[in-house]
């Protein structure tokens, strides 16, 4: 059974590389969308309960950002929480967690969010938060408990206030959906490993 912290540094390095590629793709998509297309791709975000908002919205939403500030804010949090997730998980688990959070969090947003176009990578960032907290809750090793405690200490209030008191057009639903998806993936992963 794979441990709470992957011992293979090559796997961790590959996970960091995967995160860097993901973040670079977000930058490229934003530059093309903003500078060349006048944000035309923004219409491909998640549009709740409409078939046109399910595909490609669930997959496209994390790559679309309303402004440079929106993108930069998400990249900073992704670098920290995604980096910690990469360190804890290693390559395979990190990629699996990322895909699960994007799909499950996006689907939950599509099912339950208010009308509008939900775009941005903050749902994924909240998913990494949920994944890290879930590692501490469900694995219960000293290292994962310390990581979960640190993440909760540094980001917990921000996460809580981002969901409870959203600003303007902030998609608190995507934040909550991402956090729940991250927690669910952490639980599912531990359950699957114990069944082996």
Feature annotation, model-predicted:
Residues 2-196:
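A detector for small-residue-rich transmembrane helices and their helix-helix packing motifs
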């Amino acid at each position: 059974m794979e441990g709470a912290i992957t011992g293979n540094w090559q796997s961790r390095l590959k996970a960091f590389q995967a995160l860097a590629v993901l973040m670079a793709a977000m930058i490229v998509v934003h530059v093309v969308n903003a500078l060349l297309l006048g944000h035309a791709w923004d219409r491909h975000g998640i549009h709740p309960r409409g078939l046109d908002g399910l595909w490609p919205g669930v997959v496209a939403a994390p790559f679309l950002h309303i402004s440079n500030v929106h993108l930069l804010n998400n990249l900073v949090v992704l670098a920290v929480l995604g980096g910690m997730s990469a360190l804890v998980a290693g390559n395979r688990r990190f990629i699996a967690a990322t895909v699960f959070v994007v799909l499950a969090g996006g689907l939950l947003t599509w099912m339950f969010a208010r009308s509008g176009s939900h775009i941005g990578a903050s749902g994924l960032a909240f998913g990494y938060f949920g994944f890290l907290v879930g590692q501490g809750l469900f694995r219960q090793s000293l290292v994962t408990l310390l990581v979960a405690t640190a993440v909760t200490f540094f980001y917990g209030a921000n996460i809580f206030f981002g969901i409870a008191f959203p600003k303007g057009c902030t998609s608190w639903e995507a934040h909550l959906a991402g956090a729940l998806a991250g927690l669910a993936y952490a639980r599912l992963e531990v359950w699957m490993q114990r069944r082996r």
